[in-house]
Regions:
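A transmembrane-helix-recognition feature enriched in membrane-embedded lipid enzymes
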Residues: 13-74, 126-130
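Glycine-rich helix-loop-beta junction characteristic of Rossmann-like nucleotide cofactor-binding loops
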Residues: 77-82
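Non-catalytic C-terminal accessory region of glycerolipid acyltransferases
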Residues: 1-18, 142-252
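Short, hinge-like loop/turn segments at secondary-structure boundaries
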Residues: 92, 129-131, 208-211
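Short, flexible loop segments at the rims of nucleotide/cofactor-binding pockets, characterized by
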Residues: 65-68, 89-90, 135-139, 169
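Membrane-embedded segments
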Residues: 96-147, 152
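Generic beta-sheet signal
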Residues: 85-91, 110, 156-162
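Generic preference for hydrophobic
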Residues: 75, 89, 112, 217-219
């Protein structure tokens, strides 16, 4: 009996793995197709100066991708956003899917702080830069503040991936102080955001998604920046990093 069970398990496991791999390849191809199709109205919105039109497009885009990939998603801590007119999300960064998860699960309109290198991507880079996102480089301090204030006036909330880039592990790495600096300069509250599960779905360097994963966004209590000065950005960064670490560790 034990031998038969072992043989049965050995025969089933490779087949299950094969089905998951096929699902992953098909889901990746379809996700690329969805992206190409949805990029057309998004790019058109950017050309027309109608950045707000991008939000419903991204809702449809991310819904299609998440359903195709069999992703189970949830968000907790929305009560922390009550009473906030605008804010800066400060999050960890594990995967390209982080952006999709924020677009899909966060209420309101969210835009991102992106490095100038994104502009080199045809069509996508132009769309990102002209739909309310903040494109920065090392010399863009004053311009970043102006763009953040403009985004605030347009009703956008800004998301900042404070680790600087993606890491292919299950750790929270040291936060850069750029988000804290921008929040203090614009006097906007910071909301810590822990993103869990996206690294398993599509790790850095992976060409195909791993379907059937669970993604969770956890929002922490906002940290008000009114009255803070530039010298407070180190302490603010540490508080944000600690909050994200605690929420990330508590995520099953």
């Amino acid at each position: 009996m034990n031998d038969e069970s072992s043989l049965s398990g050995a025969a089933t496991l490779p087949r299950d793995n094969l089905l998951m791999r096929v699902w992953g390849v098909v889901a990746t191809i379809l996700s690329v197709l969805y992206t190409a199709i949805c990029l057309i109205p998004a790019w058109t919105s950017a050309r027309l100066g109608k950045g707000h039109w991008v939000t419903p497009v991204t809702r449809i885009w991310t819904w299609l991708i998440f359903r195709t990939c069999g992703i189970k998603d949830e968000i907790e801590g929305l009560e922390h956003l009550k009473g906030l007119d605008s804010f800066i999300l400060v999050a960890n960064h594990k995967s390209l899917v982080d952006i999709l998860a924020v677009f899909r699960l966060m209420p309101g309109e969210v835009r991102f702080v992106a490095k100038r290198e994104i502009m080199k991507v045809p069509v996508f880079g132009y769309t990102m830069a002209n739909c309310g996102n903040i494109v920065i480089d090392r010399q863009s301090g004053g311009r970043a503040i102006r763009h953040a204030l403009a985004a605030q006036r347009e009703g956008y909330n800004i998301c900042f991936f404070a680790e600087g880039h993606r890491f292919n592990d299950d750790l929270i790495h040291e936060f850069n102080d750029g988000a804290a600096w921008l929040a203090i300069a614009t006097k906007q509250p910071c909301v810590p955001l822990a993103i869990s599960g996206t690294g398993a779905l599509m790790p850095r360097g992976s060409k195909f998604v791993r379907p059937g994963q669970r993604i969770r966004l956890s929002l922490g209590a906002p940290i008000l920046t009114a009255g803070m000065r530039g010298g407070d950005r180190v302490e603010l960064t540490q508080r944000l990093e600690t909050a994200v670490r605690v929420m990330y560790r508590s995520t099953p």
